[in-house]
Amino acid sequence: MTKYIFVTGGVVSSLGKGITAASLGRLLKNRGLNVTIQKFDPYINVDPGTMSPYQHGEVFVTDDGAETDLDLGHYERFIDINLNKYSNVTTGKIYSSVLQKERRGEYLGGTVQVIPHITNEIKERVYRSGRETNADVVITEIGGTVGDIESLPFLEAIRQIKSDIGRDNVMYIHCTLIPYLKAAGEMKTKPTQHSVKELRSLGIQPNIIVVRTEMPVSQDMKDKLALFCDIDTKAVIEARDADTLYAVPLSLQEQNMDQIVCDHLKLDNPAADMTEWTALVEKVRNLSKKTKIALVGKYVELQDAYISVVEALRHAGYSFDTDVEVKWVNAEHVTAENVQELVGDTDGILVPGGFGDRGVEGKIVAIQYARENKVPFLGICLGMQLASIEFARNVLGLEGANSSEINPDTPYAIIDLLPEQKDVEDLGGTLRLGLYPCKLAEETNAYNAYNEPVVYERHRHRYEFNNQFRPDMEKAGFVFSGTSPDGRLVEIVELKDHPWFVAAQFHPELVSRPNRPQPLFHDFVRASITNKESK
């Protein structure tokens, strides 16, 4: 029978519930179990697709085109699985589904209520995730903190699941904070005690408490927490700040967390073999070289907006025993006068995805600098579109060239709406989303990176290169190295007379893994290292 683990959080948000859940998933997978994982977000948006990155961070796109929480990126990178649309559920999705059923008459004229209708819908999403993947273990992270009014239906639903399928098939893990008061020189357990009290008042008794802390947790403190929270002392797990995220699974294993889980769920699996993972962490901790990449974006104040990009750069660096340092450059501050000062000390330049016109001209200046000074360049989504616009303006001399998204009245719409997007009015869930094939031209940097004729990558865009300009740009040395199989849509562009200048319409960062870097990032970092060594 499928087992279910629920991860909740208390005291404050951003405690690392997602990393805890992902780390446990990796440990259980390495015990030979088929693991899937999902995130329940209590906000009323249907998905984060239309939310500002300042509100939510990165939008992570799955193979099947779901726009999801950034924690799914952690899940995929840690557990090395590809998730789907069932892996992220919001209050908005739940209510939308229930209301549609009510309109269809599926409730037979009954009064639709939070209990049982909303809670039953939540439970169905939990069970469906296990059914769709045939999982041995389903890990479900509940977003927000215990006590939030938005979370109550989710907590009630996961409480009911234990009654539905039995205590041996359900486990509750609660993540909390033990703050350190510097002035007093003390760590305080009271917030954790109150958080667990709140959870228990809702009918959920945690089986494991994971305490986030800056300082070591003494045995006396663990005993105190165990007493007040009514759990075994060994089930108080310390989650101290780590030098690398990838060390967290090893820390949890050292404290036997995965064994406690298996004992509770009656899973008789051998211990997790973490030899390869340990080697990865040792490599990460002992990188001998450095390279610096400029990330020119408009959300640089909130680095979570580009978390998969940064992780993909790091993964690529691991292959070359290199620590990739990211220099955050606010695109709004970049001008032709100061670009040398802002990016001149870096070994490569990356322009990531985005929407809207803010910071666009600064990104174009940075791209021009990379092109003219032979600095390795990687453009992603909007970065690819702006690389095309920069070339049209400054090489072809098409003054005023732009994207119709940024300037609907541009005389040269180098980037324009996809034909199928012309009549779309809704913003949410209407982009070109998910995994699509890309055919690569031989003897190009893109082909050399992948070494395959056709690759599949994840997309999230509404605008596309305007084929009207392809012949003139090709004549001038602009290479269309990747297209859709029918040749209609431009997927990858690069420059002929440049050491390494590649830009992709898709989001290659979404499929990178710590032990298997994404090919374009791998070659971009290699080119950046070569550039540094040649200076």
Swiss-Prot record:
Q: Which domain of life is it from?
A: Bacteria
The broad enzyme category this protein falls into is: ligase
Which parts of the sequence bind CTP? 13, 148-150, 188-193, 224
Q: In which pathway does it act?
A: Pyrimidine metabolism; CTP biosynthesis via de novo pathway; CTP from UDP: step 2/2
List the transmembrane segments: none
Q: Where is this region: Amidoligase domain?
A: 1-267
Q: How is its activity regulated?
A: Allosterically activated by GTP, when glutamine is the substrate; GTP has no effect on the reaction when ammonia is the substrate. The allosteric effector GTP functions by stabilizing the protein conformation that binds the tetrahedral intermediate(s) formed during glutamine hydrolysis. Inhibited by the product CTP, via allosteric rather than competitive inhibition.
Pfam families documented for this protein: CTP_synth_N (PF06418), GATase (PF00117)
Positions annotated to bind L-glutamine: 54, 354, 382-385, 405, 462
Reactions catalysed, semicolon-separated, are: UTP + L-glutamine + ATP + H2O = CTP + L-glutamate + ADP + phosphate + 2 H(+); L-glutamine + H2O = L-glutamate + NH4(+); UTP + NH4(+) + ATP = CTP + ADP + phosphate + 2 H(+)
Query: What InterPro entries does this protein map onto?
Result: Class_I_gatase-like, CTP_synthase, CTP_synthase_N, GATASE, GATase1_CTP_Synthase, P-loop_NTPase
What does the function comment of this entry state?
A: Catalyzes the ATP-dependent amination of UTP to CTP with either L-glutamine or ammonia as the source of nitrogen. Regulates intracellular CTP levels through interactions with the four ribonucleotide triphosphates.
PANTHER family referenced in this protein's UniProt entry, alphabetically: CTP SYNTHASE, CTP SYNTHASE-RELATED
Subunit text: Homotetramer.
Q: What else is known?
A: CTPSs have evolved a hybrid strategy for distinguishing between UTP and CTP. The overlapping regions of the product feedback inhibitory and substrate sites recognize a common feature in both compounds, the triphosphate moiety. To differentiate isosteric substrate and product pyrimidine rings, an additional pocket far from the expected kinase/ligase catalytic site, specifically recognizes the cytosine and ribose portions of the product inhibitor.
**What is this protein identified as?**
CTP synthase
The upper taxonomy is: Bacteria, Bacillati, Bacillota, Bacilli, Bacillales
